[in-house]
Amino acid sequence: MPHLHIAEFKEVEIPSSKDGVSFNFIAKNSSHQEEKLISITVDEDEFFLLAIDENSKKLLKSDKLTRPPSIFNVHKALLSYASATCMNIISSNVPQNQKNIHLREVKALKDINYFATTFPKKEKICIEVGFGSGRHLLHQAQNNPNILYIGIEIHTPSIEQLLKQISIKNIENILVLNYDARLFMELVPSNKIDKIYVHFPVPWDKKPHRRVISTAFIEEARRILNIGGTLELRTDSENYYAYSYETFIAFEKTTLHINKNRDIAITSKYEDRWKRMQKNFYDVTMINSEESPELSLEGDFNFSHVKLNTQEVINLYKKTQKFDSGFINFERSYFLDDGAMLRVSMGNFDKPEHLYVIVKENKAYYYPKTPLRSKSNLMAHKLLNGVLCE
């Protein structure tokens, strides 16, 4: 995580700008005075910097929830803020002079809104969930230039490594997304995808609810796969294989191909290591045979007239509201100069979204972006609207 270790935190003039970075407003945590969020705009990216101003720790870093795809814009924002306030930097992991030309402007890296607004219309599309080193994804893309590959990963170093290779090799048929694949699949149009690769997912033996393969995931895979499309699981965990097989076979109608220790054209560096250790590998490939109805969701993320005053909004901190398939949890509350802001987790129990909601002048809106359009998020928004506005 990019950060600056500073001698003393100083507030920047609001609103102001420096070196192409705009400082929009500051949100102050209502329960932890040492924590502040600074709203930043760099190019088309809008996000928060997080300031921690404790006696033993004074840091300025990017806010995890709103961190943009471009790490360069985060670096630029941190250094510009420090320069604008003349802060003394004790130590830093932010490069001040060196710039990786392979990562500075990468068209392959996309935000979730890119897919939510207009999903790619390529004739053949494949998805890889958790691409790791990217070796398999790069191999597939280079050998199938007419197919669009969407690589989904939440590990930032893996993303940066893949983007560098895409730039060096000048590959134009890969799109990269830093997002939860389970949520992403909820916005994919029906019958659109040729293949879904899930290679060596984390087994999560102690937290099975976090596993990628689940009944809900398979249902979404069946919906978005075209007829003859496949979901391919590859794992070295016998427990995960057994669990996945039982989950697949529980469907009333399904076609599966099972392989053990199958050789494939390209392997990851971890797979090479595990082969030397003589570990077993299991493949479960589900073949879709049904056409699904078009995706249809009703509702929006607009708020009605807010009836709570600023202090009542602040007092929602730590409260939770539940509904049949999800919840809303008010994780943080913040004071603004002209209102309040909430950090909420909402949606499905197993795959919630974490968002900010600004409330001022009897109006409310999500910041810096609205939730992903999904059934559980629309239901959660309806409940949140009721809390704030009814």
Swiss-Prot record:
Please give the family membership noted in the entry.
Belongs to the class I-like SAM-binding methyltransferase superfamily. TrmB family.
Question: Which terms does the record give in the GO molecular function aspect?
Answer: tRNA (guanine(46)-N7)-methyltransferase activity
Q: Which reaction does it catalyse?
A: guanosine(46) in tRNA + S-adenosyl-L-methionine = N(7)-methylguanosine(46) in tRNA + S-adenosyl-L-homocysteine
Instruction: Name the residues that bind substrate.
Output: K206, D236
Q: Which domain of life is it from?
A: Bacteria
Query: What protein name applies here?
Result: tRNA (guanine-N(7)-)-methyltransferase
Matching Pfam families: Methyltransf_4
Q: Which InterPro entries match?
A: SAM-dependent_MTases_sf, tRNA_(Gua-N-7)_MeTrfase_Trmb, tRNA_methyltr_TrmB_bact
What pathway is this protein said to act in by its record? tRNA modification; N(7)-methylguanine-tRNA biosynthesis
| Assigned EC number | 2.1.1.33
On whether Methyltransferase is a keyword of this UniProt record, the answer is yes
What keywords are annotated for this sequence in UniProt? Methyltransferase, S-adenosyl-L-methionine, Transferase, tRNA processing
Q: Which residues bind S-adenosyl-L-methionine?
A: E128, E153, D180
PANTHER family in the record, alphabetically?
3-DEOXY-D-MANNO-OCTULOSONIC-ACID TRANSFERASE/TRNA GUANINE-N 7 - -METHYLTRANSFERASE, PENTACOTRIPEPTIDE-REPEAT REGION OF PRORP DOMAIN-CONTAINING PROTEIN
The protein's matches in CDD domains, at most eight in alphabetical order, are given as: AdoMet_MTases
Q: What does this protein do?
A: Catalyzes the formation of N(7)-methylguanine at position 46 (m7G46) in tRNA.
Cellular component terms, GO, for this chain's entry?
tRNA methyltransferase complex
